[in-house]
Amino acid sequence: EFAIIFEVDSKDNAISIMENLRKKVEDLKIIACNSTICNYLTISIGLGYIKKASPDANSDQIYDEVDKLLYESKDNGRNQITTRDIIV
């Protein structure tokens, strides 16, 4: 697992960027040799959109919220994006 933090002008733009990444990985058709879930490598994404963080927000809070979204993507079938506005 890894995190990507980036600035965008809108939530729709963030979703578009992440969907493009998800699709590019899927299109690579990298064989997942020992996977019992799928034949090819895919990615599940938890995307949290923060319009404006409070001054006392910390990175642990943000990470915890986005991590929950990632596991929603995995639990709902993988190879997808789960997104939500995050208020911190």
Residue spans for each PLM region:
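GGDEF/GGEEF active-site signature
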Residues: 3-51, 83
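Catalytic-core segments of nucleotide cyclases and related cyclic-nucleotide turnover enzymes
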Residues: 11, 15-19, 50-82, 88
